[in-house]
Structure formats: C-alpha cells, structure tokens
A protein has these predicted regions:
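Conserved catalytic core of the tyrosine transesterase superfamily
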Residues: 1-189
Length: 189
C-alpha cells in the first residue's frame, strides 16, 4: 500500500481588529449592552463561554478585576477591566431594571441570561452592518496581539489568556512589522 504525502495547507494569519475597526463597531452598536459586551471581550480576552457564565457579583469594582472560571480545564484566572470597559460595563448595569444575577441579559423582558449564540448573532449583525468581520474570539486575539506589541512578556500574556503552552499564545499574537523594524534598528543596526 502506498503512503500518501500530507498536503500542506497554507496557514491563514488571522488578523486582529484595528483600532479604527473597534471604534467603528462601537459607534454602530445598537445599545449600551452591546458596547459593554465588546469592551468586556476586549479588556478581559475572555472566551465567549466564560463570559456567558459570569454574574454581576463576579466583578470586583474596587480592583477592576474579574475571576474567570475557565471552561477549558475548569481552572480560574484573574483578568482586569480597562477604565473604558469599567465605564461602559458600569453604565450598562445602571441602565438595567431587572434582578437577574447574570452579567449580560437580553434587552427584552423577562431579561434572560445571554447565551453564546445571542452574542455571536449580535456581533455578526453588527459586522454585516459595518462590513467588518466580527466574532467574539477576534476580540481575544486583538487584546493578546496588542499586549504583545506593547511589550508585555509572552509568559504574562500566556497567563492572562489562560493558556497552558506558550505555543498556543503565539498563535494569537500577531507581531506588527513596525515593532520588528524598531527592534531591529534598536538591537542590530
């Protein structure tokens, strides 16, 4: 029996959002909840399954942090809220008139906990409206890439993302050509 050669499939580099795309999405969001969700996804780099399980009480407003209970491996990790995220999340929570403990709920009564599909659908609709390919995991990729490009060590990014292996983190971090050029000039040229 002959062995078949493995076909090499070129790996597509998945691009993060640009700052302009993030702002365009925010400006076209339907409501405060949607802005808060996008800010939260970016700030925490949380997986969508982790976000939909969160409750209001999980937010530590004093330290602007959240303990995420991971769906992968059931481990927990601490993530932080940017000032922008804390502002939009607080504004959203103040606008709610329900008693549901869930962090994110539907806009219409009876205000049920949002599921993965609801957030994915909201982002897909917003993406079609703005002509930007938008999905929850792209916010995670964007934050991890931004962290790498701003000089945060890979080991710290790995810990923040909840990855077991640095290789996994490296698949998320897209190094900018500008940073490569600057490093070359600083250390080599």
């Amino acid at each position: 029996m002959r062995r078949l050669k493995k076909i090499k499939v070129p790996r597509m580099i998945k691009k993060p959002f640009s700052q302009a795309e993030m702002e365009h999405l925010r400006c076209n969001a339907e409501c405060q909840r949607d802005i808060a969700i996008m800010a939260f996804l970016y700030s925490t780099a949380a997986r969508i399954g982790e976000v939909v399980r969160l409750n209001r009480k999980d937010i530590d407003w004093g330290n602007k942090e959240v303990i995420i209970y991971g769906e992968k491996g059931k481990k927990e990790r601490r993530v932080y809220l940017t000032d922008d995220c804390a502002y939009h999340l607080h504004k959203y929570l103040l606008s709610r008139d329900d008693t549901n403990p869930a962090l994110f709920v539907s806009n219409k009564k009876p205000h049920t906990r949002l599921g993965k599909q609801a957030i994915q659908s909201m982002l897909r609709t917003l993406g079609q409206k703005t002509e930007i390919h938008a999905h929850p995991h792209k916010f995670r990729r964007t934050l991890l890439t931004d962290a790498g490009n701003r000089g945060i060590p890979l080991q710290e990014i790995q810990m923040y993302a909840g990855h077991q292996k640095p290789d996994t983190t490296m698949m998320y971090v897209t190094v900018s050509e500008e940073n490569v050029r600057a490093s070359f000039r600083r250390y080599i040229a």
